[in-house]
């Protein structure tokens, strides 16, 4: 997704900053959840960071700012540990211009055409922060909000209340995102939301993955399998045309494991496409994707209850963002597999609905499973 200008009106001062995890460090093996202060905002609100460790020594760090994933430490086939998510060592990077590294995006993840949608006969105007379109909830989406965190047995639950009219959306929306790190080496995301007025909801996590390690170069040598056999065709601004096309053996076809870079030059601007998942039974987890780094042997499998998955190859990373360890994140240094409803669904009644009404509960689950071989 495109970088966007940070529009925070207040300058944010930091304190008590916490250094990022170092590649190659052997993790502890006692399962735990520990909380620290990552920094402090100018209104004196703390930003908390939680370290979740499972019994196998797999470790994730998550923060209240943007209900975000900061680090994910995973061993390779030889047991060497690396952080496989792009991001920053310190909080200040997340408070300034960045491409949604690891954060929860909403109220509506992905694009809404021309920054407007009509619901129950009323048209709602939203910010156009991605060319002519609305992207990831607007100028101050869920990624730029400080959530409340609560440690659980093997994870953290984050909650946020989005006020009626925030970023132009109707209804007071109460949102929860729970991160769980299981002893099966799964990082699980569970989303819930309720509203007091009809609204639209589409939530995802915008982690950028590099299974060779954050900052280890581009991901074009990763091998990807995408199980869906169809994708939503888009115009030149990333908005669906309404046509759902078959991957049919072309550059979009990852139904069999394929190096991401193999057909990359055939896709104008790189991959940034929503694949259509055959979800089957409502609420059931369905295998959506698998990615492998041949050099390290690390493997990540993705399953979800969502009807779509956005495959994005970090096309707008240009070296201007300095991330973990002082690395300049260049084009294609990370890939995103964002589980979601389709882009522009509020304006496409033929797509799976993103409407949420009072008395209903939005629920969604996505699981990332890690291994090495």
Region spans (language model):
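An exposed, glycine/acidic-rich loop-and-rim segment of catalytic or binding clefts
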Residues: 23-58, 64-373
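Bacterial N-terminal signal peptides that target proteins for export
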Residues: 1-7
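Bacterial N-terminal signal peptides
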Residues: 7-17
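Boundary at the C-terminal end of the N-terminal hydrophobic targeting segment
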Residues: 19-21
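A subset of signal/propeptide-processing and intrinsically disordered low-complexity segments
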Residues: 1, 12-13, 25, 66
């Amino acid at each position: 997704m495109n970088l966007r200008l940070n529009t925070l009106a207040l300058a944010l001062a930091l304190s008590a900053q916490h250094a990022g995890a170092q590649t190659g460090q052997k993790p502890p093996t006692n399962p735990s959840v520990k909380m620290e202060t990552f920094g402090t905002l100018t209104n004196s609100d703390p930003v908390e960071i939680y370290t979740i460790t499972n019994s196998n020594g797999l470790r994730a760090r998550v923060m209240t700012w943007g209900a975000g994933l900061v680090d994910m430490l995973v061993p390779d086939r030889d047991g060497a540990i690396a952080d496989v998510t792009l991001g920053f060592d310190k909080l200040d990077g997340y408070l300034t211009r960045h491409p949604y590294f690891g954060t929860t995006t909403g109220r509506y993840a992905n694009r809404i055409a021309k920054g407007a949608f009509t619901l129950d006969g009323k048209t709602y105007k939203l910010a156009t922060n991605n060319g002519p379109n609305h992207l990831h909830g607007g100028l101050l989406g869920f990624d730029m909000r400080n959530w409340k965190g609560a440690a659980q047995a093997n994870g953290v639950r984050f909650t946020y209340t989005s006020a009626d009219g925030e970023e132009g959306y109707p209804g007071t929306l109460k949102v929860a995102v729970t991160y769980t790190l299981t002893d099966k080496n799964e990082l699980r995301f569970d989303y819930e939301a309720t509203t007091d007025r009809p609204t639209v909801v589409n939530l995802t996590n915008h982690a950028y993955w590099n299974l060779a390690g954050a900052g280890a170069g581009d991901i074009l040598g990763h091998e990807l399998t995408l199980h869906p056999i169809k994708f939503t065709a888009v115009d030149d601004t990333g908005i669906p045309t309404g046509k759902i096309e078959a991957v049919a053996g072309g550059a979009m076809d990852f139904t069999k494991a394929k190096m991401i870079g193999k057909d990359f030059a055939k896709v104008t601007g790189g991959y940034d496409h929503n694949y259509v998942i055959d979800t089957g039974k409502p609420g059931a987890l369905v295998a959506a994707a698998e990615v492998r780094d041949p050099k390290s042997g690390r493997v990540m499998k993705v399953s979800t209850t969502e009807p779509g998955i956005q495959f994005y190859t970090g096309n707008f990373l240009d070296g201007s963002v300095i991330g973990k360890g002082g690395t300049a994140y260049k084009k294609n240094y990370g890939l995103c597999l964002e589980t979601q409803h389709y882009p522009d669904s509020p304006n496409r009644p033929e797509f799976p609905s993103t409407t949420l009404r009072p008395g209903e509960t939005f629920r969604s689950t996505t699981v990332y499973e890690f291994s090495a071989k």
